[in-house]
Amino acid sequence: MSTVNVLRYSALGLGLFFGFRNDMILKCNAKKKEEQAQYEEKLKLVEEAKKEYAKLHPVVTPKDVPANASFNLEDPNIDFERVILNAVESLKEAST
């Protein structure tokens, strides 16, 4: 009779242990899933805010300067990218 009781209580203990473990795993997975959903919602709101900001504050691009325009290289606000690109364009036009 004692062996039967040992087996019975051992099975009960194992059942409680695995039940508790399974419950904790399920709760942890549910919590992670909820946090991921909240994070995705925040990302969605950030993207919407970026789109709205882009609508309210459009990017102003400087107008293209003709290739034959002269530049003041002493100007502290000179756009070197534009100067170089215009020089390359003028060289392309001259070679064709």
Swiss-Prot record:
The keyword Transport applies. GO terms for cellular component: mitochondrial inner membrane; mitochondrion; proton-transporting ATP synthase complex. The keyword Transmembrane does not apply. One of its GO terms (molecular function) is proton transmembrane transporter activity. GO terms for biological process: cristae formation; protein-containing complex assembly; proton motive force-driven ATP synthesis. The modification N-acetylserine is found at residue 2. F-type ATPases have 2 components, CF(1) - the catalytic core - and CF(0) - the membrane proton channel. In yeast, the dimeric form of ATP synthase consists of 17 polypeptides: alpha, beta, gamma, delta, epsilon, 4 (B), 5 (OSCP), 6 (A), 8, 9 (C), d, E (Tim11), f, g, h, i/j and k. Present with 4590 molecules/cell in log phase SD medium. Belongs to the ATPase e subunit family. Mitochondrial membrane ATP synthase (F(1)F(0) ATP synthase or Complex V) produces ATP from ADP in the presence of a proton gradient across the membrane which is generated by electron transport complexes of the respiratory chain. F-type ATPases consist of two structural domains, F(1) - containing the extramembraneous catalytic core, and F(0) - containing the membrane proton channel, linked together by a central stalk and a peripheral stalk. During catalysis, ATP synthesis in the catalytic domain of F(1) is coupled via a rotary mechanism of the central stalk subunits to proton translocation. This is ATP synthase subunit e, mitochondrial. It comes from Saccharomyces cerevisiae (strain ATCC 204508 / S288c) (Baker's yeast). The gene is TIM11.
